[in-house]
C-alpha cells in the first residue's frame, strides 16, 4: 500500500505541535496527477483549522496546507496537460462533481454537489484528504496548474490560495487600468490584493490599522495609504472607490460596515474575502445604508481560468509576494507566528522529509 508522510496535528490541545505521520493517499484515477511536494505556503486557513477557530478538527491525524508546489511524478491516462517532471501547483480545492451547471460554466470553485477541499475533507472513495505539509499529493487534473518559468517556486506557492482568493474577485469584477480599488487590511491576503490590483493598472487605496504597514503598502504599489486609527478615516474617500476588497473581520460589531460601503461609487462593489474565527452576524445595517447603490458580496478562491490568468499576470508583470522560507520542520513556529500576526506577509515551507528529484 502506498503511503505519504506529513507534519500532522495529532492532539487538538496542542494545536501548533505537528508530528510526522504516514497516511494513505486517495486511490489514483485516470484524471489524477500525483506530485512530490517541494513547497507549501502557510495560510490563515491552516491556523483557523489547527486551532479549531472554525470548529472541531474532527478526523485526526490532520495534515494541513493548500498552497502547494511540486514536481509531477505520475499522471493518469486521461491527463494530457501535464507530464512527469513538470513543476505545478495545487490550491485549496482538489475536486468537484465536474457535472453540475457551475462546474460546466467554469465556476467549479462554487460547486455545491462535490466540493473537495485539499485537506480536512473526504474523497468519494472515503479516503481522508491530507494537505501539503507533506511529501506528496494527488488531485484531479482540473485543480492542478502549470507554473510559468518566470515565477520561482517560493513565490508561486502562496498564490494558489491567498493570491487567487483576491485576484479572482478583481478579475471577475472587471478591474482594469484606472479602476479605483480599495484594499481593507494589509496582511497576507491584503498584500496580494495590492500587488495584483497594481499589476492590473488600478489606482490602489490601501487601508490598514497598522502604522508599520503604511510604507510597506506603498512599496507594494498602493498610490494611497490610509491609517484606519481615526474614526473618520473614511470621510475623504466617500463615493471614491469602484471596488473594495475586504480581508478583515467585518463581522466584528466595532467595525462599521456601512462606513466602508459609503466609500463606494454608485454601483461600486464591496467584496468580502476574510474568513475569521468568529461566527458573528453582519454588523447592524439598515435599508437606507444601501441607497448609495452599493453591492455587497463575497468570493471563494477561484476557478482554473482565474488561476491560469493570475499566473500569467504574475509572470508578465513580475509580481513578487513578500515571503519568508522555512523548512517544514519549523511549521510550528510558522503557524504560531501567523496566529500572532507576526509574519510579513507569507511563510512558505520547504520540503525536508524527503528530497524531490528535479526540484
Task: Give a label for each model feature.
Residues 177-186, 198-259:
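Adenosine-nucleotide cofactor-binding segment
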Residues 190-191:
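N-terminal Rossmann-fold NAD(P) dinucleotide-binding loop
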Amino acid at each position: 500500500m502506498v503511503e505519504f508522510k506529513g507534519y500532522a496535528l495529532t492532539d487538538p490541545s496542542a494545536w501548533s505541535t505537528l508530528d510526522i505521520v504516514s497516511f494513505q493517499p486517495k486511490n489514483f484515477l485516470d484524471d489524477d496527477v500525483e506530485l512530490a511536494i517541494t513547497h507549501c505556503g502557510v495560510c490563515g486557513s491552516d491556523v483557523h483549522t489547527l486551532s479549531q477557530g472554525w470548529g472541531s478538527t474532527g478526523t485526526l491525524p490532520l495534515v494541513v496546507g493548500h498552497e502547494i508546489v511540486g514536481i509531477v511524478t505520475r499522471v493518469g491516462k486521461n491527463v494530457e496537460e501535464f507530464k512527469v517532471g513538470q513543476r505545478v501547483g495545487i490550491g485549496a480545492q482538489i475536486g468537484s462533481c465536474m457535472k453540475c451547471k457551475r462546474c460546466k460554466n467554469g465556476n467549479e470553485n462554487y460547486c455545491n454537489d462535490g466540493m473537495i477541499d485539499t485537506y480536512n475533507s473526504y474523497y468519494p472513495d472515503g479516503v481522508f484528504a491530507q494537505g501539503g505539509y507533506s511529501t506528496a499529493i494527488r488531485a484531479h487534473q482540473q485543480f492542478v496548474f502549470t507554473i510559468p518559468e518566470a515565477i520561482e517556486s517560493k513565490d508561486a506557492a502562496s498564490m494558489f490560495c491567498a493570491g487567487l482568493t483576491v485576484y479572482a474577485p478583481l478579475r471577475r469584477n472587471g478591474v482594469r487600468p484606472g479602476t479605483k480599488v480599495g484594499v481593507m487590511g494589509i496582511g497576507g491576503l491584503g498584500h496580494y490584493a495590492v500587488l495584483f490590483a497594481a499589476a492590473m493598472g488600478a489606482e490602489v487605496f490601501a487601508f490598514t490599522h497598522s502604522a508599520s504597514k503604511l510604507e510597506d503598502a506603498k512599496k507594494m504599489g498602493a498610490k494611497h495609504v490610509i491609517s484606519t486609527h481615526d474614526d473618520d478615516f473614511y470621510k475623504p474617500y466617500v463615493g471614491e472607490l469602484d471596488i473594495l476588497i475586504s480581508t478583515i473581520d467585518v463581522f466584528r460589531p466595532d467595525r462599521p460596515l456601512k462606513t466602508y460601503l459609503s466609500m463606494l461609487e454608485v454601483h461600486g462593489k464591496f467584496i468580502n474575502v476574510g474568513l475569521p474565527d468568529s461566527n458573528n452576524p453582519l454588523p447592524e445595517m439598515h435599508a437606507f445604508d444601501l441607497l448609495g447603490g452599493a453591492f455587497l458580496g463575497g468570493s471563494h478562491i477561484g476557478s482554473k481560468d482565474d488561476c491560469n490568468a493570475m499566473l500569467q499576470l504574475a509572470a508578465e508583470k513580475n509580481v513578487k509576494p513578500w515571503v519568508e522560507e522555512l523548512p517544514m520542520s519549523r511549521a510550528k513556529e510558522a503557524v504560531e507566528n501567523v496566529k500572532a500576526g507576526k509574519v510579513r506577509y507569507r511563510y512558505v515551507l520547504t520540503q525536508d522529509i524527503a528530497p524531490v528529484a528535479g526540484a
